[in-house]
Amino acid sequence: MSGSPAKWKRGLLIAACIILGVPLVLFLGLMATITIMYGPTYAYRVLVYNEATIQDYQRVFPSRAVSNQPPPFIFTRAEQPLTIGQLCFTYPAGNTQTIDFEPYLAQSDSTAFIVIKDDTVLYEKYLNGYSQDSVQRSFSMAKSITSTLVGLAVQDGYIHSLDDKMVGYLPELKGRGLDEMTIRDLLVMNSGIAFNLLPKDAFILSQPFYDEALMYYLPNTRSHILKLHAGREPVGAYFLYDDYYPLLEALIIERTSHKTISAYTEEKLWTQLGMEYPASWSLDSEQDGFEQAASGFNARAIDFAKFGRLFLKDGIWEGRQILPIGWGKEATSPDPNDKRPWMNDPNWKDAGGYYKYHWWGIVNEDGTYDYTATGSPGGQIIYISPSHNAIVVHNGASGDPMVWAMIARSIVHGLK
């Protein structure tokens, strides 16, 4: 070696500055770009929080309360809890998996698992510090709630027909290639709207520019969705799952009813179904106050089960018709005329699955069908099996909702 110790120290310091400085410059440049394009709140949220978690209703977003109303409806409890042992299920991709349920549940970051048949709770367990009164985040299960509010808005006369053109309610979208898109197109997620789908292998620094991140973290969702335009695919040519559809539905309900989505949920659902606890909708921001209708409903697992029960009873609750007559079946049953190719999640379709009104359905071997409200991350599900008169709810911090749907299916189909 040659050179004085002082020169070596100076050289090491320069090298360290370069090594540490380059990532910092890149990060600051990324933050500046995102801030210019979408504002400082979005830049902060997407870069600091990045991945969505089940704590986002507390750590990221403000919320608006959804009150319940006594008396609560209480499910009967089985005298002897259901024992769930080894399960074998086939994932929609085609691979079969065998698990020992209890160890699998314990190791899966689950927070709640409930099995109900004939209005009787056969199994109810809370894990990882959660209890029955712990708040669970819906993620995309919220879409099924939003679509239900659409049906109620039709019943109340706020929406004339599902076949109405979307632009009749949102005239800002006229002349953007979306004039023929109907409210029904939104409910079945027909292609038509440009949507930048996040690839599974997307470079982490590119993720803030994809629509999934934008729809989750933007503080001004209304103004963003009113700038949408047509995509490359014609309306109805494909099934294209994305978050714009329920947000557009929510905006239509908000405009026609002159009520917030939270107030309408409270009036039409949460005070009508004997919910044991209040709930809330997460908002994009305090200033804009628009509900996260695609991903942000917060409630207890047992009350999610009651929402499932409403559909199991075809919209009737304790003798009262809550949903429009026939809505439960219309929203969840397979459509034999739906021949669309799927742009995403094709394995579900290949396994006999379908998508309708923000429910994921699957046709059984005997011709009956089950359906699920799903949310990710965390494997959130409300699984409903009409032929078995059963409901399964799972909440968690990680996991694939389609895997949990197949686990629920295996359990339910094994019940006597």
Task: Name every feature range the model reports, one short phrase each.
Residues 132-133, 200, 207-287, 292-295:
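Catalytic-site signature segments of enzymes, centered on catalytic residues
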Residues 189, 245-252, 293-317, 380-396:
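Active-site-proximal alpha-helical segments within enzyme catalytic domains
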Residues 275-282, 332-391:
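Active-site Gly/Thr loop motif
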Residues 156-198, 255-294, 299, 326:
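Active-site helix/loop module of the DD-peptidase/beta-lactamase fold
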Residues 2-130, 159, 188, 192, ...:
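N-terminal leader/targeting segments and the immediately adjacent pre-domain N-terminus
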Residues 9, 27-45, 371-416:
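Structured C-terminal helix/loop/strand segments within mature extracytoplasmic catalytic/sensor domains
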Residues 119, 137-162, 186, 249-253, ...:
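Active-site SXXK
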Residues 102-103, 131-135, 153-239:
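Active-site-proximal loop and beta-strand segments within enzyme catalytic domains
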